[in-house]
Curated annotation (Swiss-Prot):
<feature type="region of interest" description="Disordered">
    <location>
        <begin position="102"/>
        <end position="148"/>
    </location>
</feature>
<dbReference type="GO" id="GO:0000981">
    <property type="term" value="F:DNA-binding transcription factor activity, RNA polymerase II-specific"/>
</dbReference>
<keyword id="KW-0238">DNA-binding</keyword>
<dbReference type="InterPro" id="IPR036864">
    <property type="entry name" value="Zn2-C6_fun-type_DNA-bd_sf"/>
</dbReference>
<feature type="region of interest" description="Disordered">
    <location>
        <begin position="1"/>
        <end position="27"/>
    </location>
</feature>
<dbReference type="Pfam" id="PF04082">
    <property type="entry name" value="Fungal_trans"/>
</dbReference>
<comment type="function">
    <text>Transcription factor that regulates the expression of the gene cluster that mediates the biosynthesis of the mycotoxin citrinin, a hepato-nephrotoxic compound to humans due to inhibition of respiration complex III.</text>
</comment>
<dbReference type="GO" id="GO:0003677">
    <property type="term" value="F:DNA binding"/>
</dbReference>
<dbReference type="Pfam" id="PF00172">
    <property type="entry name" value="Zn_clus"/>
</dbReference>
<dbReference type="InterPro" id="IPR007219">
    <property type="entry name" value="Transcription_factor_dom_fun"/>
</dbReference>
<keyword id="KW-0862">Zinc</keyword>
<dbReference type="GO" id="GO:0006351">
    <property type="term" value="P:DNA-templated transcription"/>
</dbReference>
<feature type="compositionally biased region" description="Polar residues">
    <location>
        <begin position="137"/>
        <end position="148"/>
    </location>
</feature>
<keyword id="KW-0479">Metal-binding</keyword>
<feature type="DNA-binding region" description="Zn(2)-C6 fungal-type">
    <location>
        <begin position="29"/>
        <end position="56"/>
    </location>
</feature>
<keyword id="KW-0805">Transcription regulation</keyword>
<protein>
    <recommendedName>
        <fullName>Citrinin biosynthesis transcriptional activator ctnR</fullName>
    </recommendedName>
</protein>
Length: 576
Protein backbone atom coordinates (compact mmCIF):
# COMPACT_ATOMS: atom_id res chain seq x y z
CA UNK A 1 0.00 0.00 0.00
CA UNK A 2 2.75 2.43 0.97
CA UNK A 3 4.73 1.60 -2.15
CA UNK A 4 1.61 2.20 -4.27
CA UNK A 5 1.10 5.73 -2.78
CA UNK A 6 4.77 6.56 -3.28
CA UNK A 7 4.54 5.44 -6.88
CA UNK A 8 1.39 7.53 -7.37
CA UNK A 9 3.06 10.59 -5.88
CA UNK A 10 6.10 10.06 -8.03
CA UNK A 11 3.83 9.86 -11.07
CA UNK A 12 2.11 13.17 -10.20
CA UNK A 13 5.34 15.03 -9.38
CA UNK A 14 8.05 14.19 -11.83
CA UNK A 15 11.60 14.84 -10.73
CA UNK A 16 12.84 18.39 -11.48
CA UNK A 17 16.16 19.07 -13.10
CA UNK A 18 18.93 20.49 -10.97
CA UNK A 19 19.06 23.77 -12.90
CA UNK A 20 16.08 26.12 -12.65
CA UNK A 21 14.11 26.23 -15.90
CA UNK A 22 11.97 29.04 -17.23
CA UNK A 23 8.36 29.01 -15.98
CA UNK A 24 5.97 26.88 -18.04
CA UNK A 25 3.91 28.72 -20.63
CA UNK A 26 0.14 28.64 -20.21
CA UNK A 27 -2.29 29.77 -17.56
CA UNK A 28 -2.20 28.85 -13.89
CA UNK A 29 -5.33 27.53 -12.23
CA UNK A 30 -7.36 29.73 -9.90
CA UNK A 31 -6.30 27.83 -6.76
CA UNK A 32 -2.58 28.30 -7.53
CA UNK A 33 -3.18 31.97 -8.27
CA UNK A 34 -5.03 32.43 -4.98
CA UNK A 35 -2.26 30.71 -3.00
CA UNK A 36 0.48 32.34 -5.15
CA UNK A 37 2.01 28.96 -6.00
CA UNK A 38 3.53 27.73 -9.22
CA UNK A 39 1.02 25.60 -11.14
CA UNK A 40 2.40 22.49 -12.86
CA UNK A 41 -0.44 22.56 -15.42
CA UNK A 42 -1.25 18.83 -15.14
CA UNK A 43 -4.64 17.77 -16.53
CA UNK A 44 -7.31 17.28 -15.45
CA UNK A 45 -6.03 18.48 -12.05
CA UNK A 46 -2.70 19.99 -11.13
CA UNK A 47 -0.65 18.65 -8.24
CA UNK A 48 -1.67 21.44 -5.84
CA UNK A 49 -5.37 20.86 -6.45
CA UNK A 50 -4.93 17.09 -6.03
CA UNK A 51 -3.19 17.59 -2.69
CA UNK A 52 -5.79 20.14 -1.57
CA UNK A 53 -8.77 18.15 -2.77
CA UNK A 54 -10.32 21.07 -4.65
CA UNK A 55 -11.60 21.47 -8.18
CA UNK A 56 -8.92 22.61 -10.61
CA UNK A 57 -10.29 25.52 -12.68
CA UNK A 58 -8.47 27.54 -15.31
CA UNK A 59 -9.91 30.91 -16.37
CA UNK A 60 -9.25 31.20 -20.09
CA UNK A 61 -10.88 34.68 -20.29
CA UNK A 62 -8.40 36.42 -17.97
CA UNK A 63 -6.85 39.56 -19.49
CA UNK A 64 -3.08 39.40 -20.07
CA UNK A 65 -0.92 40.99 -17.40
CA UNK A 66 -0.01 44.64 -18.15
CA UNK A 67 3.17 46.55 -17.38
CA UNK A 68 4.30 46.96 -13.82
CA UNK A 69 3.16 49.96 -11.82
CA UNK A 70 5.07 53.09 -12.78
CA UNK A 71 6.59 51.55 -15.90
CA UNK A 72 4.64 53.72 -18.35
CA UNK A 73 5.43 56.89 -16.41
CA UNK A 74 9.11 56.01 -16.35
CA UNK A 75 8.98 55.24 -20.05
CA UNK A 76 7.37 58.60 -20.83
CA UNK A 77 10.02 60.37 -18.76
CA UNK A 78 12.78 58.57 -20.63
CA UNK A 79 11.25 59.46 -23.98
CA UNK A 80 11.03 63.11 -22.92
CA UNK A 81 14.65 62.94 -21.78
CA UNK A 82 15.81 61.64 -25.15
CA UNK A 83 13.70 64.12 -27.09
CA UNK A 84 15.25 66.95 -25.11
CA UNK A 85 18.79 65.66 -25.51
CA UNK A 86 18.65 64.84 -29.23
CA UNK A 87 18.54 68.45 -30.51
CA UNK A 88 21.42 69.39 -28.22
CA UNK A 89 23.53 66.46 -29.41
CA UNK A 90 23.90 67.99 -32.84
CA UNK A 91 25.25 71.18 -31.21
CA UNK A 92 27.93 69.56 -29.07
CA UNK A 93 30.66 70.44 -31.55
CA UNK A 94 29.99 74.17 -32.03
CA UNK A 95 29.02 74.62 -28.37
CA UNK A 96 32.01 72.87 -26.86
CA UNK A 97 33.61 76.22 -26.03
CA UNK A 98 30.43 78.02 -25.04
CA UNK A 99 28.47 77.63 -21.85
CA UNK A 100 25.12 79.44 -21.70
CA UNK A 101 25.02 79.02 -17.93
CA UNK A 102 27.95 81.33 -17.30
CA UNK A 103 28.24 83.61 -20.33
CA UNK A 104 25.90 86.61 -20.23
CA UNK A 105 23.89 87.83 -23.19
CA UNK A 106 26.06 90.74 -24.26
CA UNK A 107 23.24 92.56 -26.04
CA UNK A 108 21.37 93.12 -22.80
CA UNK A 109 22.49 96.37 -21.18
CA UNK A 110 20.11 96.36 -18.24
CA UNK A 111 22.50 94.50 -16.00
CA UNK A 112 25.59 96.22 -17.31
CA UNK A 113 27.23 93.10 -18.75
CA UNK A 114 29.43 93.89 -21.73
CA UNK A 115 31.34 91.98 -24.37
CA UNK A 116 34.59 92.48 -22.51
CA UNK A 117 33.18 90.94 -19.37
CA UNK A 118 31.92 87.99 -21.36
CA UNK A 119 35.35 87.35 -22.78
CA UNK A 120 36.93 87.57 -19.35
CA UNK A 121 34.48 84.98 -18.06
CA UNK A 122 35.35 82.50 -20.75
CA UNK A 123 39.06 82.88 -20.05
CA UNK A 124 38.95 82.87 -16.28
CA UNK A 125 37.12 79.83 -15.00
CA UNK A 126 34.70 78.40 -17.53
CA UNK A 127 32.15 75.97 -16.15
CA UNK A 128 31.73 72.55 -17.72
CA UNK A 129 30.03 72.26 -21.05
CA UNK A 130 27.66 69.60 -22.26
CA UNK A 131 30.47 67.86 -24.12
CA UNK A 132 32.42 66.84 -21.04
CA UNK A 133 32.99 63.08 -20.77
CA UNK A 134 31.27 62.69 -17.43
CA UNK A 135 28.05 64.23 -18.70
CA UNK A 136 28.08 62.96 -22.29
CA UNK A 137 24.87 62.92 -24.26
CA UNK A 138 23.37 59.63 -25.41
CA UNK A 139 23.84 58.35 -28.92
CA UNK A 140 20.94 58.89 -31.29
CA UNK A 141 20.69 55.14 -31.76
CA UNK A 142 20.31 54.49 -28.05
CA UNK A 143 17.08 52.69 -27.27
CA UNK A 144 14.58 53.99 -24.79
CA UNK A 145 15.17 51.10 -22.46
CA UNK A 146 18.87 51.94 -22.23
CA UNK A 147 18.39 55.63 -21.45
CA UNK A 148 19.80 56.48 -18.03
CA UNK A 149 17.17 57.13 -15.43
CA UNK A 150 17.61 59.46 -12.49
CA UNK A 151 16.94 56.60 -10.10
CA UNK A 152 20.24 54.98 -11.02
CA UNK A 153 22.35 58.14 -10.87
CA UNK A 154 22.83 57.97 -7.13
CA UNK A 155 24.98 54.93 -7.74
CA UNK A 156 26.87 56.29 -10.73
CA UNK A 157 27.19 59.96 -11.65
CA UNK A 158 27.96 60.53 -15.28
CA UNK A 159 29.61 57.15 -15.55
CA UNK A 160 32.66 58.50 -13.71
CA UNK A 161 32.61 56.72 -10.39
CA UNK A 162 29.99 55.14 -8.12
CA UNK A 163 28.54 57.26 -5.35
CA UNK A 164 28.77 54.88 -2.44
CA UNK A 165 26.71 55.16 0.72
CA UNK A 166 29.80 56.39 2.56
CA UNK A 167 30.32 59.21 0.05
CA UNK A 168 26.64 60.13 0.27
CA UNK A 169 26.86 60.28 4.06
CA UNK A 170 29.97 62.46 3.89
CA UNK A 171 28.35 64.84 1.41
CA UNK A 172 25.26 65.14 3.59
CA UNK A 173 27.40 65.90 6.62
CA UNK A 174 29.46 68.43 4.67
CA UNK A 175 26.28 70.22 3.71
CA UNK A 176 25.03 70.56 7.26
CA UNK A 177 28.48 71.59 8.48
CA UNK A 178 29.29 74.17 5.81
CA UNK A 179 26.12 75.20 3.98
CA UNK A 180 23.27 74.89 6.46
CA UNK A 181 24.61 77.55 8.89
CA UNK A 182 24.03 80.07 6.08
CA UNK A 183 20.94 78.60 4.38
CA UNK A 184 18.76 77.16 7.13
CA UNK A 185 15.92 75.63 5.14
CA UNK A 186 16.33 71.92 5.93
CA UNK A 187 15.44 69.93 9.02
CA UNK A 188 18.47 67.68 9.35
CA UNK A 189 16.84 64.66 10.97
CA UNK A 190 13.88 64.78 8.60
CA UNK A 191 16.11 65.07 5.53
CA UNK A 192 18.42 62.24 6.58
CA UNK A 193 15.38 60.08 7.33
CA UNK A 194 14.18 59.97 3.74
CA UNK A 195 17.60 60.45 2.11
CA UNK A 196 18.66 56.93 3.14
CA UNK A 197 15.74 55.35 1.30
CA UNK A 198 16.49 54.14 -2.21
CA UNK A 199 12.94 54.81 -3.42
CA UNK A 200 12.32 58.57 -3.49
CA UNK A 201 9.99 60.81 -5.40
CA UNK A 202 11.59 63.01 -8.03
CA UNK A 203 11.48 66.23 -6.01
CA UNK A 204 13.38 64.64 -3.14
CA UNK A 205 16.01 63.26 -5.49
CA UNK A 206 16.43 66.72 -6.95
CA UNK A 207 16.84 68.19 -3.47
CA UNK A 208 19.35 65.49 -2.53
CA UNK A 209 21.46 66.24 -5.58
CA UNK A 210 21.21 69.98 -4.94
CA UNK A 211 22.50 69.34 -1.41
CA UNK A 212 25.40 67.34 -2.82
CA UNK A 213 26.09 70.04 -5.40
CA UNK A 214 26.70 72.71 -2.77
CA UNK A 215 28.50 70.30 -0.46
CA UNK A 216 30.94 69.27 -3.20
CA UNK A 217 31.58 72.91 -4.13
CA UNK A 218 32.79 73.58 -0.59
CA UNK A 219 34.82 70.37 -0.40
CA UNK A 220 38.35 69.76 -1.64
CA UNK A 221 37.79 66.01 -1.69
CA UNK A 222 34.59 65.94 -3.76
CA UNK A 223 34.88 69.13 -5.80
CA UNK A 224 35.35 67.14 -8.99
CA UNK A 225 31.76 65.87 -8.62
CA UNK A 226 30.03 69.24 -8.39
CA UNK A 227 29.52 69.79 -12.12
CA UNK A 228 27.93 66.36 -12.59
CA UNK A 229 25.68 66.87 -9.57
CA UNK A 230 24.70 70.32 -10.81
CA UNK A 231 23.92 69.24 -14.37
CA UNK A 232 21.91 66.24 -13.16
CA UNK A 233 19.89 68.37 -10.74
CA UNK A 234 19.05 71.03 -13.32
CA UNK A 235 18.20 68.46 -15.97
CA UNK A 236 15.90 66.49 -13.70
CA UNK A 237 14.17 69.60 -12.37
CA UNK A 238 13.41 70.57 -15.95
CA UNK A 239 12.29 67.06 -16.91
CA UNK A 240 9.99 66.79 -13.92
CA UNK A 241 8.32 69.98 -15.10
CA UNK A 242 8.08 69.00 -18.77
CA UNK A 243 6.93 65.42 -18.30
CA UNK A 244 4.79 65.82 -15.19
CA UNK A 245 1.19 66.79 -14.67
CA UNK A 246 0.80 70.57 -14.81
CA UNK A 247 -1.95 70.36 -12.20
CA UNK A 248 0.00 68.17 -9.79
CA UNK A 249 0.72 69.70 -6.36
CA UNK A 250 4.14 71.26 -5.81
CA UNK A 251 6.44 69.75 -3.20
CA UNK A 252 8.41 71.82 -0.72
CA UNK A 253 11.49 69.83 -1.72
CA UNK A 254 11.24 71.14 -5.27
CA UNK A 255 11.38 74.75 -4.05
CA UNK A 256 14.26 73.92 -1.74
CA UNK A 257 16.16 72.41 -4.66
CA UNK A 258 15.65 75.54 -6.78
CA UNK A 259 16.82 77.79 -3.92
CA UNK A 260 19.98 75.74 -3.41
CA UNK A 261 20.68 75.65 -7.14
CA UNK A 262 20.19 79.43 -7.39
CA UNK A 263 22.64 79.86 -4.51
CA UNK A 264 25.15 77.56 -6.19
CA UNK A 265 24.86 79.44 -9.48
CA UNK A 266 25.33 82.74 -7.69
CA UNK A 267 28.49 81.41 -6.03
CA UNK A 268 29.75 80.19 -9.41
CA UNK A 269 28.90 83.63 -10.93
CA UNK A 270 26.40 82.07 -13.34
CA UNK A 271 24.39 85.25 -12.87
CA UNK A 272 21.66 84.78 -15.44
CA UNK A 273 21.07 81.17 -14.50
CA UNK A 274 20.93 82.16 -10.83
CA UNK A 275 18.28 84.77 -11.57
CA UNK A 276 16.19 82.32 -13.58
CA UNK A 277 16.47 79.56 -10.98
CA UNK A 278 15.55 81.99 -8.21
CA UNK A 279 12.56 83.10 -10.28
CA UNK A 280 11.38 79.48 -10.48
CA UNK A 281 11.56 79.27 -6.69
CA UNK A 282 9.60 82.52 -6.28
CA UNK A 283 6.78 81.37 -8.54
CA UNK A 284 6.55 77.97 -6.89
CA UNK A 285 6.39 79.70 -3.50
CA UNK A 286 3.43 81.69 -4.79
CA UNK A 287 1.88 78.56 -6.28
CA UNK A 288 2.04 76.80 -2.90
CA UNK A 289 0.72 79.98 -1.24
CA UNK A 290 3.49 79.88 1.34
CA UNK A 291 2.91 83.58 1.97
CA UNK A 292 -0.26 82.73 3.92
CA UNK A 293 0.75 79.73 6.02
CA UNK A 294 -0.50 81.39 9.22
CA UNK A 295 -3.60 82.98 7.77
CA UNK A 296 -6.46 83.10 10.32
CA UNK A 297 -8.75 81.49 7.75
CA UNK A 298 -6.69 78.29 7.84
CA UNK A 299 -7.20 75.55 10.45
CA UNK A 300 -4.61 75.17 13.24
CA UNK A 301 -1.55 73.14 12.36
CA UNK A 302 -1.61 69.63 13.94
CA UNK A 303 1.20 68.96 16.36
CA UNK A 304 2.52 66.16 14.16
CA UNK A 305 3.00 68.63 11.29
CA UNK A 306 4.76 71.39 13.24
CA UNK A 307 8.23 70.60 11.89
CA UNK A 308 7.00 70.32 8.31
CA UNK A 309 5.10 73.60 8.61
CA UNK A 310 8.10 75.35 10.14
CA UNK A 311 10.24 74.08 7.27
CA UNK A 312 7.78 75.66 4.83
CA UNK A 313 8.08 78.96 6.69
CA UNK A 314 11.85 78.83 6.36
CA UNK A 315 11.61 78.05 2.66
CA UNK A 316 9.32 81.02 2.12
CA UNK A 317 11.50 83.48 4.02
CA UNK A 318 14.67 82.28 2.31
CA UNK A 319 13.01 82.85 -1.06
CA UNK A 320 11.82 86.26 0.17
CA UNK A 321 15.33 87.13 1.33
CA UNK A 322 16.91 85.99 -1.93
CA UNK A 323 14.35 87.98 -3.91
CA UNK A 324 15.18 91.18 -2.04
CA UNK A 325 18.94 90.67 -2.29
CA UNK A 326 18.80 90.18 -6.06
CA UNK A 327 16.49 93.18 -6.45
CA UNK A 328 18.83 95.34 -4.36
CA UNK A 329 21.78 94.25 -6.45
CA UNK A 330 20.14 94.91 -9.82
CA UNK A 331 17.56 97.61 -9.01
CA UNK A 332 14.70 95.29 -9.95
CA UNK A 333 11.08 95.31 -8.77
CA UNK A 334 10.37 93.06 -5.78
CA UNK A 335 8.55 89.82 -6.64
CA UNK A 336 7.37 88.72 -3.17
CA UNK A 337 5.48 91.71 -1.80
CA UNK A 338 5.62 92.07 1.98
CA UNK A 339 2.16 93.64 2.18
CA UNK A 340 0.35 90.36 1.40
CA UNK A 341 2.41 88.12 3.70
CA UNK A 342 0.58 86.27 6.46
CA UNK A 343 3.37 83.86 7.40
CA UNK A 344 5.23 84.13 10.68
CA UNK A 345 8.98 84.59 10.79
CA UNK A 346 10.92 81.34 11.30
CA UNK A 347 11.93 80.07 14.73
CA UNK A 348 15.60 79.99 15.78
CA UNK A 349 17.42 77.10 14.14
CA UNK A 350 18.25 75.33 17.41
CA UNK A 351 14.57 75.05 18.36
CA UNK A 352 13.68 74.06 14.82
CA UNK A 353 16.22 71.22 14.70
CA UNK A 354 15.15 69.96 18.13
CA UNK A 355 11.58 69.57 16.90
CA UNK A 356 10.20 72.22 19.25
CA UNK A 357 9.82 75.27 17.00
CA UNK A 358 8.93 78.53 18.69
CA UNK A 359 6.08 80.49 17.15
CA UNK A 360 7.68 83.54 15.54
CA UNK A 361 6.24 87.00 15.13
CA UNK A 362 4.74 88.44 11.97
CA UNK A 363 7.03 90.66 9.92
CA UNK A 364 5.00 93.80 10.58
CA UNK A 365 5.32 93.19 14.33
CA UNK A 366 9.00 92.27 14.31
CA UNK A 367 10.09 95.22 12.21
CA UNK A 368 8.80 97.67 14.84
CA UNK A 369 9.83 95.66 17.90
CA UNK A 370 12.46 97.37 20.06
CA UNK A 371 13.01 94.33 22.32
CA UNK A 372 12.97 91.06 20.34
CA UNK A 373 11.52 88.06 22.18
CA UNK A 374 13.84 85.65 20.35
CA UNK A 375 17.18 86.27 18.67
CA UNK A 376 17.73 85.00 15.15
CA UNK A 377 20.39 86.44 12.80
CA UNK A 378 18.41 85.19 9.83
CA UNK A 379 15.31 87.08 10.96
CA UNK A 380 17.42 90.22 11.30
CA UNK A 381 18.60 89.71 7.73
CA UNK A 382 14.98 89.38 6.59
CA UNK A 383 14.01 92.61 8.37
CA UNK A 384 17.01 94.49 6.94
CA UNK A 385 16.19 93.21 3.47
CA UNK A 386 12.61 94.41 3.95
CA UNK A 387 13.84 97.92 4.81
CA UNK A 388 16.00 97.95 1.68
CA UNK A 389 13.08 96.64 -0.35
CA UNK A 390 10.85 99.45 0.87
CA UNK A 391 13.50 102.03 -0.01
CA UNK A 392 13.86 100.51 -3.46
CA UNK A 393 10.10 100.46 -3.98
CA UNK A 394 9.69 104.08 -2.85
CA UNK A 395 12.38 105.27 -5.26
CA UNK A 396 10.88 103.32 -8.16
CA UNK A 397 7.35 104.42 -7.30
CA UNK A 398 8.36 108.07 -6.92
CA UNK A 399 10.05 108.13 -10.33
CA UNK A 400 7.05 106.54 -12.06
CA UNK A 401 4.56 108.91 -10.43
CA UNK A 402 6.69 111.88 -11.42
CA UNK A 403 6.65 110.73 -15.06
CA UNK A 404 2.86 110.29 -14.96
CA UNK A 405 2.40 113.68 -13.34
CA UNK A 406 0.72 112.22 -10.27
CA UNK A 407 1.03 113.63 -6.77
CA UNK A 408 3.52 111.55 -4.83
CA UNK A 409 3.92 111.46 -1.05
CA UNK A 410 6.77 113.46 0.41
CA UNK A 411 9.99 111.55 -0.23
CA UNK A 412 11.81 112.99 2.77
CA UNK A 413 9.12 111.85 5.21
CA UNK A 414 9.14 108.30 3.85
CA UNK A 415 12.91 108.12 3.92
CA UNK A 416 13.10 109.50 7.44
CA UNK A 417 10.71 106.81 8.69
CA UNK A 418 12.81 104.05 7.07
CA UNK A 419 15.97 105.57 8.54
CA UNK A 420 14.46 105.50 12.04
CA UNK A 421 13.50 101.84 11.65
CA UNK A 422 16.97 100.97 10.36
CA UNK A 423 18.65 102.81 13.23
CA UNK A 424 16.55 100.77 15.66
CA UNK A 425 17.58 97.48 13.99
CA UNK A 426 21.26 98.41 14.12
CA UNK A 427 20.93 99.10 17.84
CA UNK A 428 19.27 95.71 18.35
CA UNK A 429 22.12 94.02 16.45
CA UNK A 430 24.72 95.64 18.69
CA UNK A 431 22.84 95.06 21.97
CA UNK A 432 21.25 91.61 21.59
CA UNK A 433 23.76 89.80 19.36
CA UNK A 434 27.45 89.04 19.90
CA UNK A 435 30.08 90.70 17.77
CA UNK A 436 31.17 88.74 14.66
CA UNK A 437 34.72 88.91 15.99
CA UNK A 438 33.70 86.90 19.06
CA UNK A 439 31.98 83.98 17.33
CA UNK A 440 32.47 82.36 13.93
CA UNK A 441 28.90 82.37 12.64
CA UNK A 442 28.41 83.08 8.91
CA UNK A 443 24.81 84.19 9.39
CA UNK A 444 25.75 86.55 12.23
CA UNK A 445 28.59 88.08 10.19
CA UNK A 446 26.27 88.52 7.24
CA UNK A 447 23.63 90.20 9.41
CA UNK A 448 26.11 92.77 10.74
CA UNK A 449 27.50 93.56 7.28
CA UNK A 450 23.99 93.58 5.83
CA UNK A 451 22.97 96.15 8.45
CA UNK A 452 25.70 98.57 7.35
CA UNK A 453 25.03 97.85 3.69
CA UNK A 454 21.40 98.84 4.30
CA UNK A 455 22.55 102.33 5.27
CA UNK A 456 24.43 102.55 1.97
CA UNK A 457 21.41 101.26 0.08
CA UNK A 458 19.16 103.90 1.63
CA UNK A 459 21.61 106.57 0.52
CA UNK A 460 21.68 105.00 -2.95
CA UNK A 461 17.88 105.29 -3.10
CA UNK A 462 18.08 108.91 -2.00
CA UNK A 463 20.70 109.70 -4.64
CA UNK A 464 18.47 108.24 -7.36
CA UNK A 465 15.76 110.84 -6.63
CA UNK A 466 17.95 113.62 -5.24
CA UNK A 467 15.84 116.13 -7.14
CA UNK A 468 12.89 115.20 -4.92
CA UNK A 469 14.69 115.88 -1.62
CA UNK A 470 13.69 119.18 -0.05
CA UNK A 471 16.86 119.79 1.94
CA UNK A 472 20.18 119.36 0.11
CA UNK A 473 22.12 119.44 3.38
CA UNK A 474 20.30 116.30 4.46
CA UNK A 475 21.67 114.46 1.41
CA UNK A 476 25.21 115.47 2.36
CA UNK A 477 24.62 114.33 5.93
CA UNK A 478 23.33 110.93 4.84
CA UNK A 479 26.28 110.54 2.50
CA UNK A 480 28.52 111.01 5.52
CA UNK A 481 26.56 108.33 7.39
CA UNK A 482 26.90 105.99 4.43
CA UNK A 483 30.66 106.57 4.49
CA UNK A 484 30.72 105.64 8.19
CA UNK A 485 28.77 102.48 7.34
CA UNK A 486 31.34 101.66 4.65
CA UNK A 487 34.12 102.06 7.21
CA UNK A 488 32.36 99.57 9.47
CA UNK A 489 31.95 97.13 6.56
CA UNK A 490 35.68 97.35 5.82
CA UNK A 491 36.42 96.56 9.45
CA UNK A 492 34.04 93.60 9.47
CA UNK A 493 35.33 92.36 6.12
CA UNK A 494 38.86 92.38 7.49
CA UNK A 495 37.70 89.90 10.12
CA UNK A 496 36.44 87.57 7.37
CA UNK A 497 40.00 87.08 6.13
CA UNK A 498 40.73 85.07 9.28
CA UNK A 499 38.05 82.48 8.41
CA UNK A 500 38.13 79.64 5.91
CA UNK A 501 36.20 80.49 2.76
CA UNK A 502 33.49 77.96 3.61
CA UNK A 503 32.81 79.86 6.86
CA UNK A 504 31.79 82.94 4.85
CA UNK A 505 28.15 83.31 3.84
CA UNK A 506 27.61 82.24 0.19
CA UNK A 507 25.82 85.54 -0.57
CA UNK A 508 28.43 87.73 1.14
CA UNK A 509 29.72 89.17 -2.17
CA UNK A 510 26.42 91.05 -2.65
CA UNK A 511 26.75 93.53 0.28
CA UNK A 512 30.54 93.73 -0.12
CA UNK A 513 30.32 94.61 -3.80
CA UNK A 514 27.56 97.10 -3.01
CA UNK A 515 29.97 98.82 -0.62
CA UNK A 516 32.80 98.81 -3.17
CA UNK A 517 30.58 100.32 -5.85
CA UNK A 518 29.39 103.04 -3.45
CA UNK A 519 32.97 104.02 -2.60
CA UNK A 520 33.96 103.99 -6.26
CA UNK A 521 30.99 106.11 -7.36
CA UNK A 522 31.72 108.78 -4.72
CA UNK A 523 35.51 108.74 -4.86
CA UNK A 524 35.61 112.21 -6.41
CA UNK A 525 33.70 113.92 -3.61
CA UNK A 526 36.19 113.20 -0.83
CA UNK A 527 39.63 111.62 -0.54
CA UNK A 528 38.30 109.41 2.27
CA UNK A 529 36.21 107.46 -0.24
CA UNK A 530 39.19 106.54 -2.41
CA UNK A 531 41.34 105.70 0.62
CA UNK A 532 38.67 103.38 1.99
CA UNK A 533 38.15 101.85 -1.45
CA UNK A 534 41.82 100.90 -1.72
CA UNK A 535 41.66 99.33 1.73
CA UNK A 536 38.60 97.31 0.76
CA UNK A 537 40.24 96.15 -2.47
CA UNK A 538 43.22 94.96 -0.47
CA UNK A 539 40.85 92.90 1.68
CA UNK A 540 39.25 91.53 -1.50
CA UNK A 541 42.67 90.19 -2.52
CA UNK A 542 42.83 88.21 0.72
CA UNK A 543 39.29 86.80 0.68
CA UNK A 544 39.13 83.43 -1.05
CA UNK A 545 36.57 82.92 -3.77
CA UNK A 546 34.37 79.86 -3.17
CA UNK A 547 34.02 79.47 -6.93
CA UNK A 548 37.78 79.00 -7.16
CA UNK A 549 39.75 79.08 -3.87
CA UNK A 550 42.91 79.91 -5.82
CA UNK A 551 41.33 83.25 -6.76
CA UNK A 552 40.16 86.17 -4.63
CA UNK A 553 37.14 88.47 -4.50
CA UNK A 554 38.86 90.66 -7.10
CA UNK A 555 37.91 87.96 -9.57
CA UNK A 556 34.27 88.37 -8.52
CA UNK A 557 34.51 92.04 -9.46
CA UNK A 558 35.69 90.99 -12.91
CA UNK A 559 32.69 88.68 -13.26
CA UNK A 560 30.20 91.17 -11.86
CA UNK A 561 27.11 92.08 -13.84
CA UNK A 562 26.95 95.78 -12.87
CA UNK A 563 28.52 98.67 -14.73
CA UNK A 564 30.08 100.18 -11.59
CA UNK A 565 31.98 97.01 -10.72
CA UNK A 566 33.31 96.54 -14.23
CA UNK A 567 34.40 100.19 -14.40
CA UNK A 568 36.14 99.72 -11.07
CA UNK A 569 37.98 96.66 -12.39
CA UNK A 570 39.10 98.45 -15.56
CA UNK A 571 40.38 101.44 -13.64
CA UNK A 572 42.07 99.21 -11.07
CA UNK A 573 43.79 97.11 -13.78
CA UNK A 574 45.03 100.24 -15.62
CA UNK A 575 46.41 101.82 -12.47
CA UNK A 576 50.24 101.85 -12.21
Amino acid sequence: MLSHEMASTAHRQPSRPTTRQRQRTGRACEECRRRKLRCDGQQPRCGVCVDSGVTCEVNSQRRPRGPKKGYLTALRNRVAMLETRLPAQHLVGPLSEFNPLSTPLTNDHHDGCSVSSASSRSDSNPPPTVSEPDMSLPNTTTSVSSAPSFATCSKDIGGAEPITELVQAELNQLYFDRVHPSIQILHQRRYLGWARNAAKKTSRRCLQYAVWTLASLLSAQFQHLQDSFYQETKRTLEFSYLSGDSNAPVDTEEIQAWILIATYESMRTFHRSAWMSAGRAFRLVQLMRLHEIDSPTKPPVPEADLVETEEKRRVFWMAYFLDHLLSMRNNWPITLNEHVICTRLPAPDMEFQSGQPVLGAFLSEAIMDVMPQTTSPFNECVILATICGRSLFHAQQYSVRFVYGELAPNWTDQHQWLDNVLTNRLQILSQYYPSPTQICDPMLSFAHIMGQASVIHLYKGMASVVWAVDDGAWVVEYQRRALSAAQEIVKLAKGLTEFNFFKVHPLMPIPLLLCAEFLYSNRGSDAAFNSLLQELLQIFRQLKNANDPSRSYIHLLELSCTTASMSLVREHSNAP
